[in-house]
């Protein structure tokens, strides 16, 4: 299949998970979503990743974002592995894990990379907006665990810039100044950004984060 691109509608699917059968779009509802794959159950990096996500679920909820994991292992394997995650990561896994034994979802989302492995998924991440469109894609090799602080930062940026005519600069964090979109003329800035702004260059104008 063709590669999924930013702005594409995230493919819908039905799948078995550790929390029952879901229809993906229905499960998302009006929420944002993070779909992320891991190569295999009972592996070290994946164990730390899912433990971290479990601890971060409250932060995702603050952002109206649901998380769901996937690997090509079976349901019983997932359930047994969850016990290890809870024990070793001092957490309680509180989100569904898809059992994609037939690789249907992995194929749909192009998570199988033959140059890495044709049997296991790479570490893919898809951030999906409330409109069911793909907002972000990331792919990590099996050897490198993901940074979920960065994922939260990106969701903050995506949600902010979806509602205001701004963009977020390098290394931006929630609460810091943002840049005004180049399409906004100087004459409109006082009305749109009443907190004020700093004019650095005609194309580089900063303003305090508008929703803070």
Task: Please identify what each model-predicted range represents.
Residues 1-212:
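Chalcogenol-based redox active-site neighborhoods
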């Amino acid at each position: 299949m063709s590669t999924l691109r930013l702005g594409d509608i995230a493919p819908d699917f039905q799948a078995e998970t550790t929390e029952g059968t879901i229809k993906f779009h229905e499960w998302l509802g009006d929420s944002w979503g993070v779909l992320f794959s891991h190569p295999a159950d009972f592996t070290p990096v994946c164990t730390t990743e899912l433990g971290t996500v479990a601890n971060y679920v409250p932060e995702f909820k603050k952002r109206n974002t649901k998380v769901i994991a996937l690997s090509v292992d079976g349901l019983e394997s997932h359930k047994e592995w969850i016990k290890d995650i809870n024990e070793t990561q001092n957490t309680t896994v509180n989100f569904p894990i898809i059992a994609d034994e037939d690789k249907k979802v992995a194929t749909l989302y192009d998570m199988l990379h033959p140059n890495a492995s044709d049997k296991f998924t790479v570490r893919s991440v898809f951030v999906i907006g409330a409109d069911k469109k793909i907002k972000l894609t990331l792919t990590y090799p099996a050897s490198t665990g993901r940074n979920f602080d960065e994922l939260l930062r990106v969701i903050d940026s995506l949600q902010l810039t979806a509602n205001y005519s701004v963009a977020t600069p390098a290394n931006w964090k929630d609460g810091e100044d943002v840049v005004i979109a180049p399409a906004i003329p100087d004459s409109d800035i006082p009305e749109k950004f009443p907190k004020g702004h700093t004019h650095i260059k005609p194309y580089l104008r900063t303003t305090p984060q508008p929703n803070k």
